[in-house]
Amino acid sequence: MQGNLLKVLGVLAIVATLVCFIFAALGMIGAVKVGDSCYMRYASDGQGGADSIIGTITLNANANYVNTAKMLSDGTTLLVPDPTRYGEWLNTQVLVENSQPVNLQVVGQVSLCLAYIPKDNLQRTGAGSNLDDNGQMIPIPRINDANNPPVSLIMDAKNNEWRNIAELYANDRVLVSVSPNFANTDATVKDAFKGAEVTQDCSENKTTYNPICGKYSVYSGEYVNACELKEKYWNCEVTWRCPTWHEQIGCDWGALGCVASCKKIPECTTKCMAWVNITRPAPENYLDDGSFTFSWSDNTGKLFIDYSALQCSYNANIPPVDKCPDRVRDRRIKDKDYIGGVHCTSGICSDGDFQKNRRFWYTADGKGGKGPTGLIYQMNDAGSVSQALPSKLEFAKFVADTDQPPDYKGKDGKYLYKVIYNIPFNSNIAKSYLQYRLWSPTSQDSSKNTGGYVLNIKQTKCYRENGNSFNDTFDDRGRVQYIIVKPSENPNTSGKTYSPQGISVDSEGKYSFNANEAGYIWMKILNDPGNNLRDYKDSEGSYKVHFSTSLKVGSFTIKVMNPLLQLFKTKVQGAATSIFKNMVCYKANDSSSCTNFFTYIKAILILYVMTYGAMFLLGFAKINQKELVIRIAKIGVVSGLMNGNTFEFFNNYLFDAITNFSDSIIANMSGYSLFTSTNTISNPFMFLDAVMSKIFFSQTFIAQLLALLSLGLSGIIYFIITFIAVCIVIITALRAVAVYIMAFMATCILIGIAPLFISFLLFDFTRYLFDNWVRFTIRYMMEPVVMMAGIIVLTQLFTIYLDFVLGYSVCWKCALPIKIPFIGTILPIALLNVPIFCINWFAPWGMDYMSGMMGVNMQNIVALVIIAYGMYGYVEFSGRIVVKLTSAVGPSATEIGGKMSHDAGQKVLSSIGMDDKTRQGITGRAEARLKQRNKTLDQAEKNRKNTQKEGGEKTNEEPPKPETPK
């Protein structure tokens, strides 16, 4: 036995080594694709017996997972998405069975389309207003795009219309900012339509500015700047008299007065003073100190001064004429004190409070206020251009400094752009437009305005997060979909039509479902497939989809042992009962097809009684009372079993009791309930279910075993030892099954021919046949019991120590770093621990290749091998025990079962040239070659000695003798 075991161990060691190097080679070339998954030691409910797999995949928004190399102008290459692979499904590498539960959580943000400058925008309106000078649409960078500045749109103050800055879909994110008020410097802005930078002088002391300077004015013409006192300025006193007789005949009647039909003649004898207006062009020159600048306000009353209503005196804007009477009669003081000052009483006066309150300019910085002065916005579902102002104006405000993007500041700490709008578009409306305009009073002619602002925009369009979806111009955009496809299919190339299932996540992005069929889960994000997949191509971002699924490990008992044993036991029991029936012709309609063995037994029994009675009467046979009782009992038993109900008695009471005796005892020893709905024992090997199910059907076990290879050179040794121990247990289990099958078959056959051997009970010279029949029946009944008693205990120990050795969760990750050896002699020591690249492989949960390898308790591995070796040896040992117990010398089920398993193993090994016959042939040929080599060396040595003697050479040293092979 020991020699056979050593041979088996040698073969298993070679196979394990080959498997080790094969998997290592696969890892080196990266041919193993299992996904970024982890096989957990226990399921989420803390129970074992299940493959609990967690994993994470990256689901790209553009549904493109293939990169191609693109040559740049500088000679370098850049990996870019393959232009022909957008909108594809991604294999999650999660293999599920039908009705298997799957839990997932979607985390991340994506933008599923790209924003472009809309029509009728701040800078242009009309047909083609959304196209640049080359006829191309102008893309808007996304908010998280730190490599590209926002798109700048120039707002001219001469435009008094609502214009669009952004087309917004449901859940869009938009970031609108305003360029600063460029003070005493040049301003440079990139014109998005021309694709070139525009630079303008924005220094102070000017009355007109380009819109990019960040300031504007609605004033034009002139305004009253001071008041001047004019003496004798106008004819203030008028008297009326009748025309004289000579001036108009018949008008003056003297004391009687004027004739009513005559017009009186005015006479101005006195001229009065008046305060006249001194005007200046509007607006005043802009000053950087804010002297003529409005502060930010959301009250239009504080944003406009009606200079036309300010007059030094009433009707001061109407000059006098040298006539009597004057054109106006009222030139009283009106706003002189406010304009010129209270204390100024002569000359030109310009010291009033008005001088300090003059305002003409609106600036993008709001003069230190809450936002850009005069900038208003609104939402418009149609995006139409109009001049109508709503009843309530929304004035733009700066967002809090904490919400200002850091990259919007320059190196000097000043804002390059300052955000004024960052509100997500959360609306039930599929689409709307964000519009802006500069406030201007309706009384002013906007065509005479000067200056303007520059608004800048970044927009993340079709924004989705954590797997949520919304309806915009495309229904359900952003919903994560999945299909379950057979392992042999690729939905991207199969040409088949599938029915995707949508995932409706909760607020945390979680979702659970049961697989509706078996296969791999494929996923992608739903987007508009139209317009040549433009939205997919414009998409950006990705989701992290965290999977967790648990599937009960397939039962070795249910899948393998039950079908095998039930089929075998049914066939054997049927054959045994058929033998019994045919021997007694039980219920046989045609007696010609069988011979009733009981007929012969009856004849023998009659002959036995007649002969023995005659001998007793003639005195040839002496018998005492004891012998008489024994002989009568034998005759009674044999004759009692020779009636028509014999088969029913054996079949109903003895047959099942004897054949299932072993199963009942084994079941009680193992502690497992083996009774089915019919209260019959179907499988005595239930104690093997846990360990054999883990070995054959558990993905987690395979991953745990392969993870040993990630522990370095020691891990390879651990793998080989553990693999050999597992193989020994498998072989032992198969040998135990073979022994059980042979014992069961022998028991059934012995019971089937029971009528024959029971008849041997009558005569002393056939008594030994009956005794041996009983011994062998008991032996084959007890042999599986004794064998299983020890294997049950050893199997439980093996299961415990196997969990000690492989009791960890496993992840597919970087496990084997490749470093340059002796790098410390060439490069700085800082590079000693930096890997060049890393091979992904199964590795224990929590193991970091940078911090050293995780150790395994060698004691547990040694114990595992000892237990496996003990199980292998116990099979034959149990057979010897039964032989001693039953004293039944002859072929045992253990020997026959061992021969069966050995022959089966040799048949498998012969395919790879590792069977005993092939190895003996190899060994024999090697020995023959070795003998021939030694013979050749001996002959060469003799020839050398003979040559020396013939040449007469002498030497004091003897030539070395050839080493005798051992």
Curated annotation (Swiss-Prot):
Q: Which family does it belong to?
A: Belongs to the TrbL/VirB6 family.
**GO BP, sorted A to Z:** protein secretion by the type IV secretion system
- The protein, known as: Uncharacterized protein RC0144
Write the signal peptide boundaries.
1-24
Keywords assigned:
Cell membrane, Membrane, Signal, Transmembrane, Transmembrane helix
Q: How does it sit in the membrane?
A: Multi-pass membrane protein
Q: Respond yes or no to whether keyword tRNA-binding is given for this record.
A: no
Q: Where in the cell is it found?
A: Cell membrane
Q: Does the keyword Transmembrane apply?
A: yes
**InterPro entries, sorted:** Conjugal_tfr_TrbL/VirB6
* Compositionally biased residues, Basic and acidic residues: 926-966
Gene Ontology CC terms, in alphabetical order: plasma membrane
Q: What is the phylogenetic placement of the source species in the record? A: Bacteria, Pseudomonadati, Pseudomonadota, Alphaproteobacteria, Rickettsiales
Renumbered residue ranges of the record's region Disordered: 918-966
Instruction: Please name the source species.
Output: Rickettsia conorii (strain ATCC VR-613 / Malish 7)
List all membrane-crossing ranges.
Answer: 601-621, 711-731, 743-763, 785-805, 822-842, 855-875
